[in-house]
């Protein structure tokens, strides 16, 4: 069996603590293929000028932090707000089908990440996996697009939080709320990551408790505890099961509704891959623990919520679209109001506000770490590597947060249209990232096979591999290709760019970086520069022996601790 430091010597276990104290693991520069992420133990005479990453992030996140960051980044606007748009457009049945379908994709992608990230835990890791095992230009393009999606998501969260607060009062203008949270979240992300992790843990814990409580409440209402009596599947009968869709014919309506539902659901699920982004600041075992619980969290926090929303709120409920549209009317609140509960909607709206703030916090954190990883790889300006005393890449934080200014688009008369525009860009960019995560994993497994190495060497072995990776690649390619095809029936330039701008941006970045690396000569079109040969794929740099990582898993002493061990 392959042992780290023997057949492919990269890092001996004896030096793991030295390396861990410095931050992220070594990465290969895209431009010169030199290690730029680590100062070797035997090279103490090397100066910081020779290694531009002397400023490094710190590995201060614990297992519960990592798991809750993944939850905190995903439970936000997508679940609490955009599910209303999904329900109205597609109906309860197609909404649930869309969620179940995207669940299979999210599970496949996170399992692929689990195998790669626990083996090579580096900050912003999956963009670097694409760089190592697909192509340098593809990795750079994907990394920038993925960063862009999180920067835009921050703008979307800012655009929504003020509108949710306006559920209570319009005394403060929307621009005022956007400005307040813009400054607060940007400032908070400049504090050391251990504070971020601890605050995010407790905020995300509030989300978890609130959702579990809402599910219990919803179950009681469906069974007849509310003023409407037993609801059951009332809104799944008599034409309520399917939304209006976009066209009249039934077959076409179902197909279009399903595609629209997928895009909306992908936006809701985006962030399940955040465990990989935190890899540079967490124990590898913490990553492994978080990956194992992805399916449980998805089923509880997404699928069950969508099921009960569809049971309690009819797709044509006027509250879904009145008074500002979907962004001000969460289906969670509508379900409570329809059941006759007076005070609980206000309490839960406070939870939603906290949730969106937390999600925005995670957006800036994730985007800044992705940008930091891009700078390490040599495809972003070097000043993004600068960190403060707390190990925070402050230039990366500020640049990522600056895109929050797009949140002011919500102040225009077409605020809801801007929300939909941002949502589609984010969802498509997220799908592209998911697709290349799966492509990277297929290449990773091929390299292992080429070297004669068994998957038994991996700290985490996923189920249904490699079949689920191929499944994700095929489905994602099809969805990205057809998700905007209705614009061609009655072509509109604005709708076209809304649907495909992420695809266009990715292609432009890919081509641009390809010529940046290889120029315009004959070498540019050599196959080995388009797709890295398996023999040249680097699966050695950054490898860690997971058994050497310090990680304590305390035994749960009571029911409460068992609950948190299950969740986080």
UniProtKB/Swiss-Prot annotation:
GO terms for molecular function: amino acid transmembrane transporter activity. InterPro entries: AA-permease/SLC12A_dom (IPR004841), Amino_acid_permease_CS (IPR004840), APC_YAT (IPR050524). Keywords: Amino-acid transport, Cell membrane, Glycoprotein, Membrane, Transmembrane, Transmembrane helix, Transport. It is found in: Cell membrane. It is a multi-pass membrane protein. Induction: Expression is negatively regulated by the transcriptional repressors NRG1 and TUP1. Expression is also regulated by SSN6. Expression is repressed by HAP43. Expression is induced by antifungal agents caspofungin and flucytosine. Finally, expression is also induced during biofilm development. GO terms for cellular component: membrane; plasma membrane. Its main location: membrane. PROSITE patterns: AMINO_ACID_PERMEASE_1. The chain crosses the membrane at residues 66-86, 89-109, 145-165, 171-191, 201-221, 255-275, 294-314, 340-360, 390-410, 419-439, 469-489, 501-521. Glycans are attached at residues 33, 492. It comes from the Eukaryota. Pfam families: AA_permease. Residues 1-24 are annotated as: Disordered. GO terms for biological process: amino acid transmembrane transport. Probable permease for arginine and lysine. Belongs to the amino acid-polyamine-organocation (APC) superfamily. YAT (TC 2.A.3.10) family. This is Probable lysine/arginine permease CAN2. It comes from Candida albicans (strain SC5314 / ATCC MYA-2876).
């Amino acid at each position: 069996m392959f042992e780290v430091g023997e057949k492919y010597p990269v890092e001996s276990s004896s030096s793991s603590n030295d390396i861990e104290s410095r931050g992220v693991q070594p990465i290969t520069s895209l431009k010169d293929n030199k290690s730029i992420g680590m100062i070797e133990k035997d090279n103490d005479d090397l100066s910081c000028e020779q290694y531009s990453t002397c400023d490094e992030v710190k590995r201060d996140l614990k297992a519960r932090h990592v798991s809750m960051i993944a939850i905190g980044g995903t439970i936000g606007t997508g679940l609490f707000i955009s599910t209303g748009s999904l329900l109205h457009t597609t109906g309860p049945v197609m909404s649930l089908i869309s969620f179940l379908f995207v669940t299979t994709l999210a599970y496949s992608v996170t399992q692929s990440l689990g195998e790669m990230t626990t083996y090579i835990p580096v900050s912003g890791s999956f963009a670097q996996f694409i760089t190592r095992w697909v192509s340098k230009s593809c990795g750079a393009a994907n990394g920038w697009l993925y960063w862009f999606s999180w920067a835009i998501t921050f703008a979307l969260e800012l655009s929504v939080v003020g509108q949710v607060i306006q559920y209570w009062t319009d005394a403060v203008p929307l621009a005022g709320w956007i400005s307040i949270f813009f400054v607060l979240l940007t400032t908070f992300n400049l504090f050391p990551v251990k504070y971020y992790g601890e605050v995010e843990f407790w905020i995300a814990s509030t989300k978890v408790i609130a959702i579990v409580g809402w599910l219990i409440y919803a179950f009681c209402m469906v069974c007849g505890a509310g003023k409407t009596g037993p609801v059951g599947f009332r809104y799944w009968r008599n034409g309520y099961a399917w939304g209006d869709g976009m066209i009249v014919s039934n077959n076409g309506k179902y197909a279009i509704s399903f595609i629209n539902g997928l895009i909306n659901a992908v936006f809701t699920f985006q962030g399940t891959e955040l465990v990989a982004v935190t890899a540079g600041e967490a124990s590898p075992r913490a990553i492994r623990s978080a990956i194992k619980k992805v399916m449980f969290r998805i089923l509880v926090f997404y699928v069950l919520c969508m099921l009960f929303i569809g049971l309690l709120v009819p797709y044509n409920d006027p509250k879904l679209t009145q008074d500002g549209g979907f962004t001000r009317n969460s289906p969670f609140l509508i379900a409570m109001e329809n059941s006759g509960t007076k005070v609980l909607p206000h309490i839960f709206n406070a939870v939603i506000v906290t949730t969106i703030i937390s999600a925005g916090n995670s957006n800036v954190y994730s985007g800044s770490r992705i940008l930091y990883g891009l700078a390490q790889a040599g495809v972003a300006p070097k000043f993004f590597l600068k960190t403060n005393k707390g190990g925070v890449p402050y230039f990366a934080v500020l640049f990522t947060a600056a895109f929050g200014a797009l949140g002011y688009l919500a102040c225009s008369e077409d605020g809801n249209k801007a929300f939909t525009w941002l949502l589609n860009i984010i969802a498509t960019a997220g799908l592209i990232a998911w697709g290349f995560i799966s492509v990277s994993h297929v290449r990773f497994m091929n390299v292992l096979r080429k070297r004669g190495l068994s998957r038994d060497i991996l700290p985490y072995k996923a189920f249904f591999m490699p079949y689920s990776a191929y499944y994700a690649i095929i489905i994602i390619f099809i969805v990205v290709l057809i998700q905007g095809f209705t614009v061609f029936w009655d072509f509109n330039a604005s709708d076209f760019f809304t649907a495909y701008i992420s695809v266009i941006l990715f292609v432009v970045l890919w081509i641009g970086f390809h010529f940046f690396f290889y120029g315009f000569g004959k070498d540019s079109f050599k196959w080995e520069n388009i797709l890295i040969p398996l023999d040249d794929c680097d699966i050695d740099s950054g490898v860690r022996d997971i058994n050497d990582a310090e990680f304590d898993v305390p035994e749960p002493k009571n029911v409460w601790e068992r609950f948190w061990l299950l969740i986080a």
